[in-house]
Structures are given as C-alpha cells and as structure tokens.
C-alpha cells in the first residue's frame, strides 16, 4: 500500500491543520486557528478530558492570549491571583520574599495559580463551539507521512481499532514529551542533564486553613518542599526525593499524610492525587520538518521552578497560529522557519534560568545550603532585593528591531474605556504618536499593510492633536514611548514588537521591510481534498 493509500472503510478528513494532542498547547493552537476560520482537526489519545491537575500557574502573557480568545473572564473562577512568593530555610527563616506586579505589562496580574482541569474545560468548550474545528478523542496516531506534494497524511486508529485518515496542509505535534509526532519531525534531543525525582501531592480543601502557605519554597537540605495553591480550594505539596527513595512506596496515602502534617490533616483536606515526577530539561534540535511542526512539551521540557512550562507551550501556539494563518492565505512558507528561530532562544533562556533557580532552591549539601542561607539572609537584612527576572526579547526571525512584548494598558475612545487589545484588536498594528508619523509610509506599502489585516492606532501622547482616536488613560503608552525614545511601533499579531521607529522616515522603512518580508507568493496550491 502506498503512503497515501486509504485502507478500506477508513474514516477521512481534509483540513488546513491537524493537531496531535489536546493539552493546553494543542487546544490553544486549535482555538487560535479556529478563530481565524482555519479548518482544524485535533487528534487526542484520551477519550475524555484529563481531569487531574498538572501545571500549577500561568502568567499575564498567557492571560492576554486567553483575552484574545474571549475566555479570560471564564478562566478566573479556576484561578487565584498570586501576589508573591516566599523562600524559607529548614529553620523557617525567610530567605526571599518577592512581590509580583499587579498589573503586569500585559494588563493582567503577573501570576495566576490555577486548577488545570478548569482551564482545559474552558478551552474545550471554546473549540467545541468553533464550526471549523473538530476534536476527535480516543485516537492513536500511527504515522505522519509527507511526500513531495503539498499535504501530510496522518494515520490514526480509534479505540475500536478502526482506521482514520487526515490529510492536512500542516501537522503540529502538541502530544507531549513522549509523543509520537517528534519521531516524524526528525532532529535529536539536546538534553541539559538535569534530573530530579519529585513526589507531587494534590489536595482538595474541605475548609479554610488560615496558616496554609499559598506559595512557599522550603529550602531545607533534608527535604526541599514546594507548597503552592493550585486555584480555589486546591493545594499542592511537592517533595524532592532522594535518588534511593522507593518511588512505589512513597505514593501510599499513609506515607503522604505524615509529610504534610505540619500544614494539613485529613480533616482539612482530601488527598486527590499523588504522582512521581522526574523533572528534566531538554530541547529538540528540529522544531520543523517541512510540513510537520512541534510545539509545547513535544519541542521542549523544563523543570517547574519558574512555572513556565505550560506558558511556554502557549507562547509557541500564539507564535505559530498567525504564521500558519498567513502561509495558508498565500504568504511565504518561509515564515514558518522563523518559528524556531524566535522561540528556541527564548525557551533556552527560561530553561537555563529554571535549572539555575532549582539548583539553588533544592540544595542537599548542608554546608552549601548554610552558606546560601547566610548570604540571602544578609542581603534581606540590608534590604537588597533581587532583580526582577525579565525574559529576553525575540531576535532573528521576523523582527526588525526590539522584539519585546508590546504592553497592554487601559485606553479610551469616545465611547469606551478598556484594555488596549479590546480597542485595537490583535492583528498587525501600527501604533503611532500622532497621525503625522504615518505620513512617510508609501501608499503601496500602506495598502499592502491593510491587505494583511493591518490597522493604525493613533495616540496623542506628546503632540496632543485634537481628536486623537485613542487616549492613553493609564499613562502606560506615554511612559513606554518615552522610555524607548520612539514615536511609533509596528506590532505583530502575537503582541511582540516587529520594530520601533524614532521618526516618520524610520517608520516608513519598517513598513517597507515588513511588506517585503510577508509579500504573497505568486500562487499557492489548492486546499487538500479527502
């Protein structure tokens, strides 16, 4: 049978994009593409939602993505805003006490603790409502075949063993660190060599426990512990295990309760989940092989010490969705080459910082831990605060300059006040301080910008011209433009800045560079047929 031959009686589907895996990354990507009208099928091996928590937190950038999807408010009942976090040593002395920004640069609180089943139920409800998106559960992907044509054929079997075929323009593997798609994408795993065994215990609270820490790292060399809330009425205790620990024995409830006795009793809470985890850090060397792409844990895995694992996967989805949409609309396929070029350095930075942080938090050497404690306590007494961790801007790829996230603050029009994205939208934007800044853009470039869905957002930050369409209600943009010494920015559909301009001439040059980079190819193949 040829690679694209169809078994007798097989079900079949033809779509723009096939997504393998319906965790947060896969569902976010499906929703983003579906909201753009792209036909999508999601193949998931589980027969239903995985109704147990895994990830514990997400940040304001992720909430901004949920805002774009129209589900930010629906996410809130499954979250708690996290105001900060504390490190203590084995003697309960405070080593570090950090406050999170509220709001963060994306207009939402910087850190949310969340109950993942709620998040996934909201995303599932959304993608189920989208007419161009189909999710098929209980599907085991057997192969992903691409030949010299313009399609990829995905072969899967359902729980009854029946064959199902999907012919897609592109396939995205969002099927996790042990997923199947990566073997068809090629490449190798670049392993950082970081391995730690942890026991993760989740509890559902029966009553309020006033002294229960909401986000605490116990840096005790005898047994490092992380204590976090994971949304309303749920709490997680994670214990770093010795390499010699009996991993089958430690999961028994009668072994778990003594570990948490300082904080919880069986009257306080119900133990709902116990799992052994091996935290590791690795990144695949190839995120794209022609029409096969990888996202989320299928492309990279990191330890949880910065709470950026799920967040990084959703960043992947946000980066990839608009590029796939443009390519499917006839823009250069080479846009997809910018995906790994932009995302991999960002992921590597976060992974390396998470490893660095984890090694400090979970020291087992008592002498080194005592030295760490003395240094951190002395710094705290001297009121020396650590620098806030800032993730790097994007570089390379489709970035002219800057490459950082464009902020989101409150803005006003003549009829309403809302967060910036609600007013401006989230396609390509030129954001300018006054209309005169736009005067140098060539008419052809302006037309081409409009044809890719581009819009103009005009403030009156310094010029204060009469009738500015948008007012900087909270001063976010006045401060941002001043800090960057610019008068305009071109913002990408994922919220990252393509480039800053100091004057009208620079803006005209940026517009010309962008239009040339994304110019449609002369022709494109028709959509696949079943």
Curated annotation (Swiss-Prot):
Keyword Amino-acid biosynthesis: no
Keywords: NAD, Oxidoreductase
Any one Gene Ontology BP term: 3-(3-hydroxy)phenylpropionate catabolic process
Record-linked NCBIfam families: PRK06183.1-3
UniProt source species: Rhodococcus jostii (strain RHA1)
EC main group: oxidoreductase
Reported phenotype of the disruption mutant: The mutant bacteria is unable to grow on GRA. Only 25% of the resorcinol is degraded compared to wild-type.
Function per UniProt: Single-component hydroxylase that is part of the gamma-resorcylate (GRA) degradation pathway. GRA is initially converted by GRA decarboxylase to resorcinol, which is hydroxylated by resorcinol 4-hydroxylase.
Name listed for the protein in its UniProt record: Probable NADH-specific resorcinol 4-hydroxylase
Signal sequence coordinates: none
Entry's EC annotation: 1.14.13.220
Keyword RNA-binding set for record: no
A GO term, aspect molecular function: FAD binding
Catalytic activity: resorcinol + NADH + O2 + H(+) = benzene-1,2,4-triol + NAD(+) + H2O
Highest taxon of source: Bacteria
Gene: tsdB
InterPro entries xref list: FAD-bd, FAD/NAD-bd_sf, PheA/TfdB_FAD_monoxygenase
